[in-house]
């Protein structure tokens, strides 16, 4: 797809739909055709959101495929590997999940970690679209909910029980990949304390596909990423052993906010569709617990949220998109929330005078950690724009939501459907033809 900055909404929607069809392997959609040729967990949820206005039935298939690879302990793995597809590292042999863990599925090859739990939002969007269709389409969506309700609750229960063992109301991650924000400055200090041992030899694939080194993590960073995988493998991915076995452990405030929102959304779905009262009660309880956990981290003056390094026993305060986690789940005192909104909309983030679009950069342009081309250290991610816009609409902030949608569509109108964008120039970066970027556009255009 050649770069063209002038696609009208109807053209853009058609191109986005064409992209998703092109990335469709039948029962799963690749995150991107070259760099990410498999199914990623939170990508799949966003893909389902984009598929829903095109075909509720196909959106259901996407989530069905993902949930069919769920571990028996409830975890949804961050990658479900497509059969017969190579070209990605680390692949299933490196993870060795089915060999090491009794919880891993035997019918699918997966990774051994998770990603942010946005899936309930996808279920909500599928049900929203199904309500506007015929009876048979509504039946497909409702049948999916009945069939997968237990799996969805088990996923949230696993996060609440196995990843918040101290009841702090915050999800502990054991790898930066679990955050979805792989190389964010949020993890710099925690990764600095990861001392790689004897990492088995490996060949990266990502920097062969995207050859601009300024856009990808370094080899030293990859050594640390892979050493953490080795530590998890040594613990056989056991939920009881990971807290002691892995040298990276951080309470992730952004994932915690997403979990709070997801539990609230799923509880409301459960009430509307007469699911078991005990499940609904648990979901509401978890939503409140993680909302409180997020709010507890916030700065009293600015409202900015912080992560917590469990290994170093200290708070991590960074000028990244994650500090706005309380705006997703709510719960801040009014004055503190207004202060956090001023920070978001001011010159340190969306109001920075040099931004091409008034969107949230992954790291503040005024931070010393800011790198405008490098992954989660500066670029603007359309999928983050979508998430903030959706959460703001849910919270009743219609104008703020509409501004993000408008600016997000302006950015995406180049038609590249890039993974992320340079915040000052608007240059598309990372993987092109990224499925979740197309999905965001399709949901915005409805």
Where do the PLM segments sit?
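Extended glycan-interaction surfaces of carbohydrate-active proteins
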Residues: 2-38, 66-106, 170-250, 289-380, ...
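Hydrophobic/aromatic-rich effector regions of fungal transcription factors
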Residues: 100-132, 387-391
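Alpha-helical support elements that line or immediately flank enzyme active sites
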Residues: 44-74, 322-333, 385-401, 405
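Long, repeat-rich segments with strong aromatic
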Residues: 245-289, 370, 374-399
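Core register positions within helices of long alpha-helical scaffolds
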Residues: 50, 122-125, 129, 262-265, ...
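Internal, well-ordered domain-core segments that constitute the primary functional module
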Residues: 115-191
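TPR repeat positional signature
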Residues: 44, 48, 116, 120-123, ...
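Extended, well-ordered alpha-helical scaffold segments
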Residues: 5-15, 55-68, 134-160, 262, ...
């Amino acid at each position: 797809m050649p770069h063209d900055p002038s696609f009208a909404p109807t053209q853009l929607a058609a191109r986005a739909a064409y992209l998703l069809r092109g990335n469709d392997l039948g029962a799963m959609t690749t995150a991107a055709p070259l760099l990410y040729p498999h199914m990623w967990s939170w990508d799949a949820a966003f893909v389902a959101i984009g598929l829903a206005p095109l075909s509720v039935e196909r959106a259901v298939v996407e989530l069905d495929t993902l949930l069919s690879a769920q571990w028996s302990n409830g975890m949804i793995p961050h990658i479900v590997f497509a059969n017969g597809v190579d070209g990605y590292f680390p692949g299933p042999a490196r993870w060795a999940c089915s060999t090491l863990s009794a919880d891993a599925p035997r019918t699918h090859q997966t990774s051994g970690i998770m990603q942010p739990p946005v899936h309930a939002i996808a279920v909500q969007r599928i049900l929203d679209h199904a309500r506007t269709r015929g009876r048979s389409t509504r039946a497909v969506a409702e049948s999916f909910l009945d069939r997968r309700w237990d799996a969805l609750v088990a996923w949230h229960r696993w996060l609440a029980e196995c990843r918040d063992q101290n009841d702090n109301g915050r999800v502990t991650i054991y790898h930066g990949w679990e955050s979805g924000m792989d190389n964010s400055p949020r993890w710099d200090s925690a990764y600095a304390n990861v001392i790689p041992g004897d990492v088995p030899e490996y060949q990266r694939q990502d920097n062969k596909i995207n050859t601009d080194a300024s856009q990808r993590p370094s080899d030293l960073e990859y050594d640390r990423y892979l050493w953490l995988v080795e530590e998890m493998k040594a613990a056989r991915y056991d939920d009881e052993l990971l807290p002691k076995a892995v040298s990276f452990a951080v309470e992730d405030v952004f994932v915690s906010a997403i979990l709070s929102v997801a539990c609230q959304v799923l509880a409301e779905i459960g009430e509307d569709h007469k699911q078991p009262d005990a499940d609904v009660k648990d979901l509401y309880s978890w939503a409140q617990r993680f909302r409180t956990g997020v709010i507890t981290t916030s700065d009293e003056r600015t409202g900015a949220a912080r992560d917590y390094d469990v290994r170093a026993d200290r708070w991590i305060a960074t000028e990244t998109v994650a500090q706005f986690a309380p705006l997703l789940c709510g719960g801040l005192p009014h004055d503190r929330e207004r202060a956090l909104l001023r920070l978001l909309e001011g010159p340190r983030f969306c109001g920075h005078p040099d931004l091409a679009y008034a969107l949230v950069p992954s790291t503040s342009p005024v931070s010393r950690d800011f790198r405008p081309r490098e992954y989660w250290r500066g670029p603007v991610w359309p999928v983050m724009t979508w998430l903030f816009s959706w959460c703001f609409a849910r919270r009743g902030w219609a104008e703020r939501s509409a501004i993000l949608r408008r600016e997000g569509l302006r950015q995406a109108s180049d038609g590249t459907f890039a993974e992320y964008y340079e915040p000052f120039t608007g240059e598309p970066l990372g993987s092109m033809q990224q499925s979740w970027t197309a999905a965001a556009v399709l949901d915005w255009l409805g």
